């Protein structure tokens, strides 16, 4: 119950910020594409973007099969606080900021980018969870068989960017909520483990 309430609070903070504020620019003004390749095979941490978990190790997402090519020299390098999205799955939420690892590589099909100095990545991450972003993104999907969002389409999406102090304040509020959610999930996990342990003891 508490976890759901915290998630709703996070959503409310995000929606209030973007619903009440008029766009003062487009995403292309605040982001830049990153397409550095893993030419020398320097990195082997192959990642995917999940619509629920963000960046995850590809080996964990597809445990029953190998998805990555043996030759990853054409894979794109993503660094901490970079963003990536699957053009064909962004409509179901497959866009994320890299926070779990310092660096990794993703399939060439992913679009990768980073924020410019005028915006903090936490604020941009919040925007990507807003209804405003979803509405504007859906209007820019293209394709006859599979709908995709190009980088150009992403750059054309209008966005409200406040001054740095407001960005930081919003980022801190959301980070605090996410931290509390993480602690509650960890606590529930421990309770479940304890329950399983006690049940096993009862039937020994």
Predicted regions and their residues:
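Juxtamembrane/interface motifs at transmembrane-helix termini
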Residues: 4-8, 19, 48-49, 62, ...
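DNA target-recognition domains and sequence-specific DNA-contacting regions of bacterial/archaeal
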Residues: 28-161
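Short, well-ordered alpha-helical packing segments
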Residues: 3, 7, 28-31, 110, ...
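Generic recognition of stable, solvent-exposed alpha-helical segments in well-folded globular domains
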Residues: 1, 8, 73, 79, ...
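Non-catalytic DNA-recognition/assembly elements of restriction-modification systems
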Residues: 5-40, 156, 160, 166
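Charge-rich, acidic-biased intrinsically disordered regions
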Residues: 25-29, 57, 198-204
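A structural feature that tracks compact, well-ordered secondary-structure segments
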Residues: 1-5, 14-17, 159-162, 168-190, ...
């Amino acid at each position: 119950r508490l976890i759901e309430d915290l998630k709703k609070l996070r959503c409310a903070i995000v929606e209030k910020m973007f619903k009440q504020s008029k766009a003062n620019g487009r995403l292309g003004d605040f982001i830049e594409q990153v397409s550095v390749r893993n030419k020398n095979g320097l990195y082997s941490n192959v990642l995917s973007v999940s619509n629920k978990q963000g960046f995850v190790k590809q080996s964990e997402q597809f445990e029953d099969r190998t998805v990555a090519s043996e030759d990853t020299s054409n894979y794109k390098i993503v660094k901490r606080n970079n963003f990536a999205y699957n053009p064909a799955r962004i409509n179901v939420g497959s866009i994320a900021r890299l926070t779990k690892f310092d660096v990794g590589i993703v399939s060439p099909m992913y679009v990768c980018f980073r924020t410019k100095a005028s915006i903090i990545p936490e604020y941009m991450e919040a925007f990507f969870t807003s209804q405003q972003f979803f509405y504007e993104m859906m209007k820019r999907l293209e394709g006859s068989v599979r709908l995709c969002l190009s980088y150009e389409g992403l750059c054309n999406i209008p966005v409200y960017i406040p001054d740095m102090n407001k960005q930081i304040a919003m980022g801190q509020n959301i980070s605090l909520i996410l931290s509390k959610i993480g602690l509650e999930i960890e606590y529930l996990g421990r309770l479940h483990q304890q329950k399983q342990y006690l049940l096993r003891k009862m039937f020994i």
